[in-house]
Amino acid sequence: MEYWYDPNHTGCLRIVDTKKQIIYGSDPTEKYWVVTYTHKNKSTLLVDFRNKKTHHGKKDLVTKYEDRNMTLHWEDGNKWRRMKNNPFLLMNTYLNK
């Protein structure tokens, strides 16, 4: 699993399941969404946003891993920043104290 921060959507969390080739997300206007992707090559993904109800524009978007896999740079200019630690570890620690 990879965890990403999306600054263009109020800093929402994105989870990329690299084994299932699925991206899970949440936005202020859509509480939960799931999209799929395929690999175009080692560093490029083609993401199918047809299942995301609030997505506007192109339904298939290309994104590329950059900055030693710390950035996902989308063709629309958005850049997701990678979170190296699982955010749920901190949440579980906080909730169980």
Q: What are the residue ranges of the model-derived segments?
A:
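Short, exposed beta-strand/loop patches in secreted or surface proteins that constitute
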Residues: 12-17, 31-41, 53-67
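Low-complexity, intrinsically disordered flanking regions
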Residues: 37, 90-97
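Short, compact, well-ordered microdomains
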Residues: 60-84
